[in-house]
C-alpha cells in the first residue's frame, strides 16, 4: 500500500448503530454515510474498554488495559507506555492532534508533536471517585443527565472550534510541498453528554416520533445482577421523568447529527485543498452509549451499546462500499496508522495483538478472529471481560454469572443463552480464549489493588469520593460547573 497521510477522526460515545449507514431508522448522518459509501464500514468493531481513558490508552498503545494498567478515568495515559505516536515522531513525522485526547496533561510526551486545544483530565487527576470499587459504595447518583434538551453547551462550541481548527490546519498543510506523510488526529466530544444540542438539531427528532425503548426494566426486562448493581450506584434512569427520557434520546440523536455536520465540514476542507487525493480517513469512537437501553445511560458495560463502536475507513486502496464483518478493535489503530504512513513495524511492534484495518478490509471476512475487551472502572462492582468471535459474544464477570449471546439470532442481546446445556462447549471454548489473553481473577485483583492504593494516596474513601468531575470533563479553560 502506498504511504499516505492519515486523518483519524474519533468522536466520543457514539453508539455503533446510530448512523444512517448502519441502518438506523431515525438518526441522520449524511457525511459519515457518504464516507462509508466511498470506503469500508465495519459491523463488528469494539472498544477495548468501555470508558474514555482506558479506551484511549488502548488506541494510543495497541495494548490491552490489563497490560498498560490505565484501568479507569483516574489513571490517564501519560506516555510511559510508548505508542504509535512516539514511533512516528522518532521517524521524523508530523503527528498532531486537535481536540479531546483525555490524557493526563499536555506537557507529557504522549506521542504528539503538537496539540491544539487539547482536552485532558481535570487537574491532571481525573475521576478519583471512580476508583472506589472494592467495595463499591452503596450509591452515588450520577449528574450525567442534569442537562437535557435544546440549547448551546460548552461541548457544542468546543466541537465547532475543533472543526474550525481542523479546516485551517488542512489549508496550511496543503501549502507544504514535503512528500512525507503526516498524521492528524481529531477528537470531537459529541455525542457524549451533556445531552444538549442546538435547537435545529434537536428539532430533527420530535419526541412523539422516536423509536420505542428497548429492553426496558419497567416493562419486564430483568437486568443481569452486575448491571443492576451498577444502576443501584448510578441511579440515573430512575430519577428521570418519561418526558426527560425521550428528550435525552432526541438530544443524543441530535448530537449524532451535529457531530456529523462538523465532520462534514472537515471532509469538505480535505477535498477543497486537494489533500483527499493522498490522505486516508478513519472515523470511529472511543466507546458507545446505552441511550436508555436496559434503563441505562452512558457506557460502562460490554453489551453492544456500550462496547461496540462505528468504524469507517476510506481512501486509496480501501474497497469502496464494502461492509466488513471481521471483528476488530481500537488497539488495531497502531498497525493501521503505521501501515497507512508506510512505517514497517519493528520486532516489538510485531508482537502486538492488533492488525491493520486496511489489510482486514481487503481480505475476506474472518470468523476466527478474536476481539477482547475489559472493564474495571467507575460504577462496576467487579471486573468484566468480553470475547467476541464469529456469531457469539461471551461476557465473563468476577463474582457473577457469565453471559453468552448469539448476535446473529439475537442482535439486541435480549436472551442470555449461557446456561443452556447445548452451549456448554461454546462456553468452555470462549472462556479459554479469555484465559489465553489474561487471568481474569488476577487481573481484577491487580486493578483493585492499584485503585485502592490511589484512593489511599488521596486520603481514603471519604475524601476520594469527592475528587474529580461529577459529570463530563470540562472543556479547555473551563472550570467544573
Please provide the spans of the model-predicted regions:
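Formylglycine-dependent sulfatase
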Residues: 1-397, 402, 411-432, 439, ...
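Residues forming the ATP-binding cleft of Hanks-type serine/threonine protein kinase domains
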Residues: 408
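Non-catalytic connector elements of ABC transporters
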Residues: 436-438, 446
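Short, charged, surface-exposed hinge/linker loops at domain edges
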Residues: 443-461
Amino acid at each position: 500500500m502506498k504511504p499516505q497521510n492519515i486523518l483519524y477522526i474519533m468522536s466520543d460515545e457514539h453508539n455503533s448503530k446510530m448512523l444512517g449507514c448502519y441502518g438506523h431508522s431515525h438518526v441522520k448522518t449524511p457525511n459519515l454515510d457518504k464516507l462509508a459509501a466511498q470506503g469500508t464500514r465495519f459491523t463488528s468493531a469494539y472498544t477495548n474498554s468501555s470508558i474514555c481513558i482506558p479506551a484511549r490508552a488502548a488506541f494510543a498503545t495497541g495494548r490491552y488495559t490489563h497490560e498498560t494498567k490505565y484501568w479507569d478515568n483516574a489513571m490517564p495515559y501519560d506516555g510511559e507506555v510508548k505508542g504509535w505516536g512516539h514511533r512516528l515522531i522518532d521517524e521524523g513525522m508530523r503527528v498532531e492532534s486537535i481536540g479531546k485526547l483525555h490524557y493526563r496533561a499536555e506537557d507529557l510526551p504522549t506521542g504528539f508533536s503538537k496539540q491544539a486545544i487539547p482536552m485532558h483530565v481535570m487537574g491532571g487527576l481525573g475521576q478519583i471517585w471512580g476508583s472506589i470499587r472494592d467495595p463499591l459504595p452503596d450509591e452515588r447518583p450520577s449528574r450525567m443527565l442534569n442537562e437535557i434538551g435544546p440549547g448551546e453547551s460548552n461541548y457544542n462550541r468546543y466541537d465547532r472550534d475543533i472543526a474550525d481548527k481542523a479546516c485551517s490546519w488542512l489549508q496550511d498543510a496543503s501549502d507544504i510541498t514535503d512528500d512525507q506523510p503526516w498524521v492528524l488526529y481529531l477528537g470531537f466530544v459529541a455525542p457524549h453528554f451533556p445531552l444538549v444540542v442546538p435547537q435545529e438539531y434537536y428539532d430533527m427528532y420530535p419526541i412523539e416520533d422516536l423509536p420505542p425503548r428497548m429492553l426496558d426494566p419497567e416493562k419486564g426486562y430483568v437486568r443481569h445482577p452486575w448491571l443492576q448493581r451498577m444502576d443501584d450506584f448510578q441511579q440515573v434512569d430512575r430519577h428521570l421523568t418519561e418526558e426527560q427520557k425521550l428528550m435525552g434520546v432526541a438530544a443524543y440523536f441530535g448530537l449524532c447529527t451535529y457531530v456529523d455536520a462538523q465532520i462534514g465540514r472537515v471532509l469538505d476542507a480535505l477535498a477543497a485543498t486537494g489533500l483527499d487525493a493522498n490522505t486516508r480517513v478513519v472515523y470511529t469512537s472511543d466507546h458507545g452509549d446505552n441511550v436508555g437501553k436496559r434503563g441505562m445511560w452512558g457506557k460502562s458495560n460490554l453489551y453492544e451499546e456500550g462496547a461496540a463502536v462505528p468504524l469507517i475507513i476510506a481512501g486509496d486502496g480501501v474497497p469502496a462500499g464494502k461492509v466488513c464483518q471481521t471483528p476488530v478493535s481500537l488497539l488495531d489503530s497502531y498497525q493501521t496508522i503505521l501501515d497507512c504512513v508506510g512505517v514497517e513495524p519493528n520486532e516489538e511492534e510485531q508482537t502486538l495483538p492488533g492488525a491493520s484495518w486496511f489489510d482486514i478490509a481487503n481480505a475476506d471476512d474472518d470468523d476466527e478472529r478474536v476481539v477482547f475487551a475489559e472493564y474495571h472502572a467507575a460504577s462496576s462492582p467487579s471486573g468484566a471481560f468480553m470475547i467476541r468471535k464469529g456469531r457469539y459474544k461471551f461476557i465473563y464477570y468476577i463474582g457473577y454469572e457469565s453471559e453468552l449471546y448469539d448476535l446473529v439470532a439475537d442482535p439486541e442481546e435480549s436472551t442470555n443463552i449461557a446456561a443452556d446445556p447445548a452451549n456448554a462447549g461454546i462456553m468452555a471454548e470462549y472462556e479459554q480464549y479469555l484465559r489465553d489473553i489474561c487471568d481474569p481473577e488476577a487481573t481484577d485483583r491487580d486493578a483493585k489493588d492499584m485503585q485502592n492504593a490511589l484512593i489511599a494516596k488521596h486520603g481514603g474513601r471519604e475524601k476520594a469520593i469527592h475528587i474529580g468531575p461529577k459529570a463530563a470533563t470540562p472543556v479547555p479553560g473551563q472550570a467544573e460547573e
